[in-house]
């Protein structure tokens, strides 16, 4: 009797799953970078049943699935930001010449509890803006990022899917230059200081035990001059890979990036200065580049809030350097995944700086279809979630957004996402605006 009761309940639950039929104006295929017309997406619960021509949808399907008419919009996978700091905020103000001062202030005056609440607000905003998955890379105290992810998974608050690193593994000093010797212990609240290869492997075990699903290392400690050694990074990579966990490296100089790639990391974050030889090695070893560039609007706002004059020549040189690096990487075939490094308070709506990283790629001459692939298909590969998200296809999670049809020629359409679905649940619906 209990078996039949269980079977009946299972059948009833299956029947109660919400079913949606999405009619897309255009559908962005993140694998091929093509915009397709006349397509429909059928969803049951949180899983995509099928993607097919709208004309092939059966009468039974039209009857049983709730229609979501997105025929005036472009439908695409939810955006993925591979480099976030949801629990970190740096406030800009004139005459602040002490790099790292805001991090010290955050540790002393904010603490993990406030930062977790701040992160919760940002996580909600990210999701509502169409960013359905993130990789959060440290600067979150002692595993407050893991706690935030737990709350999202338990349904306590809305937010994107999260990969979490916990404290980044760093050489002496972390990213807090000027901290006097007496107060070096403060740095350990934000970074895991690595002392040698054996300690480096132990640090990996600590983070994995606490719930980290990616390991963030600092190949160099910009703005501090200290660096991890190749042997220390190799020890980290070997230990992380034993547990099936990826390692991605903060590396702002070519030397730091090259050393990290030699050590076997899976990703390079920032990579502002990359020689062709380093890019070639990245292609050979399949290392992903996450360029955390800002667009011209963000750069202008940064200078304004910092009390600096806007120098057109300086801005042009800065943007040209970023353009050169990403263009060379793209032409060589380096796998590029989108990431923002969004932690500065630009006095913009939460999540807008993340979108502006994508706009920066456009300003550097990358075609829009490639940019959308960076933020979906490639980003999912970088997070090792490419069998469940990043593409709209059968069996994948229903993480779907819709933007204006102008997206093919207007990258700014990403700033105004009109529809968001995560896990088969409608989060944002602004179709009538």
Residue ranges and their predicted role:
Residues 88-114, 172-188, 285-319, 333-336, ...:
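Active-site gating loops and adjacent loop-to-helix segments of metal-dependent hydrolytic enzymes
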Residues 1-18:
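Bacterial Sec-dependent N-terminal signal peptides
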Residues 73-150, 154-156, 260-263:
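Metal-associated gating/positioning segment near the N- to mid-region
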Residues 138-142, 146, 153-259:
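Histidine/acidic-residue-rich, glycine-tolerant segments that coordinate divalent metal ions
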Residues 18, 32-76:
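Histidine-rich, glycine-flanked metal-binding segment
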Residues 108, 112, 119-145, 159-167, ...:
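Divalent metal-dependent hydrolysis catalytic cores, especially in the metallo-beta-lactamase
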Residues 242, 320-406:
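His/Asp/Glu-enriched, well-ordered alpha-helical/loop segment
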Residues 172, 217-323, 337, 342-347, ...:
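Active-site core of metal-dependent hydrolases
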